[in-house]
């Protein structure tokens, strides 16, 4: 894990994250113009960072947030499509991989159903290697149709990469799912706004540590007329320590080199903090001392997860018993979100 240079090597993957200023767009033509702006930025960045193997842009960086529902549906993309072809040309020209946001991607039943919030991982030949749809849209505000699966793909120089989006990263389950599938770098693209800056910086570092995984966060900056975005795009080592972090500046870039051999060695030889290994070898020292084998306990001890898989509706009812039974709240109603009406006093 190296920070401060502009290079990379056969062992290290040069990763850049961008504080992209949140655009405010309304038409397909504006979206495509903005995609070309991103493409130009990629080529320029490669000139300044010759070791850059992977460049990552935030959630909403291509489309901005379409606060008008009609505009959101009209500008929803297909994958592949016009936007991805612009990015493909830039990746080929700069000879880099890229992670790009599409908000949204047309649903299979478009326009009857809401679009997806989608990320793509594209290789240096302009080919889409991974397409991920946001599993946890930021309700009640975001109206995206939820995805249902994480993926791991071989990225530049063989580094194993998973994509997640913004609010996904508030749930430890998704980080663990990616890491346990073999991800060595988890990319979190977000369009996160104030007031949650401190929490999001902490979350990314904690999840890197807990999952023995590199984390790259690309976040929006600026003000789009509705929200103020805090930036702080960052690259974090698998030991939970920050390698490089932007401030709030528009178009800020951070860059670091992520070693393949180092993370693989740590996962193979780490002991007291090898969280992935220890989770399925629980208490092996005590079992060895008790004559009960030398590999620890593999079974999951967490009742919630077993119940959730076996009985999702029953688990939902259990959670509603100590939270609430409607998606909305009567004390802070949001238009279109059902809630219990306050009784007449």
Curated annotation (Swiss-Prot):
Catalytic reaction annotation: a monocarboxylic acid amide + H2O = a monocarboxylate + NH4(+)
Pfam family, one: CN_hydrolase
Enzyme class: hydrolase
Keyword Hydrolase: yes
Domain (CN hydrolase) ranges: 13-260
Enzyme Commission number(s) of this protein: 3.5.1.4
The entry's keywords: Hydrolase
InterPro entries: Aliph_Amidase/BUP (IPR050345), Aliphatic_amidase (IPR023719), C-N_Hydrolase (IPR003010), C-N_Hydrolase_sf (IPR036526)
Active site: residue positions: 59, 134, 166
Domain of life: Bacteria
Sections of the chain in a coiled coil: none
Magnesium listed as a keyword: no
GO MF annotation: an example: amidase activity
Family statement: Belongs to the carbon-nitrogen hydrolase superfamily. Aliphatic amidase family.
Functional description taken from the UniProt entry: Catalyzes the hydrolysis of short-chain aliphatic amides to their corresponding organic acids with release of ammonia.
Protein name as annotated: Aliphatic amidase
Species per Swiss-Prot/TrEMBL record: Bradyrhizobium sp. (strain BTAi1 / ATCC BAA-1182)
Taxonomic path: Bacteria, Pseudomonadati, Pseudomonadota, Alphaproteobacteria, Hyphomicrobiales
